[in-house]
Amino acid sequence: MIQSPTSFLIVLILLWCKLVLSCFIECLVALQQLIHVLLQIINSNLQSRLLLWHSLD
């Protein structure tokens, strides 16, 4: 009688952990994409500044 709710609770905790882990992975992927986009913006900004700087010489 006691074992059934306990095993149910364990399954519930495992499912919750799986959900949290998948959300965490999704957040990491989104963060990685955001960093990639930001780096591209910074890179293009630096390139345009360098071109402008060389054209002024």
Swiss-Prot record:
Domain of life of the organism encoding this protein: Viruses
Signal peptide: 1-22
Signal recorded as keyword: yes
Entry keyword annotation includes Kinase: no
GO biological process per UniProt: symbiont-mediated suppression of host innate immune response
Annotated keywords: Host-virus interaction, Inhibition of host innate immune response by virus, Interferon antiviral system evasion, Signal, Viral immunoevasion
Protein role: Involved in resistance to IFN.
Protein name, as recorded: Non-structural protein 3a
Species: Avian infectious bronchitis virus (strain Portugal/322/82)
